């Protein structure tokens, strides 16, 4: 199923983006 792979890829990218933003804010606050 192509849709499932696309959904998983989107979810992983979205999660990675949020983690990157949180990490960036944490480093910026220090």
Curated annotation (Swiss-Prot):
It is a single-pass membrane protein. InterPro entries: PSI_PsaM. The keyword Magnesium does not apply. The chain crosses the membrane at residues 7-29. Keywords: Chloroplast, Membrane, Photosynthesis, Photosystem I, Plastid, Thylakoid, Transmembrane, Transmembrane helix. GO terms for cellular component: chloroplast thylakoid membrane; photosystem I. It holds the Pfam family PsaM. NCBIfam families: PS_I_psaM (TIGR03053). This is Photosystem I reaction center subunit XII. It comes from Pinus thunbergii (Japanese black pine). The gene is psaM-A.
């Amino acid at each position: 199923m192509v849709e499932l792979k696309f959904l998983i890829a989107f979810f992983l990218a979205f999660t990675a983006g949020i983690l990157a933003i949180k990490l960036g804010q944490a480093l910026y606050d220090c």
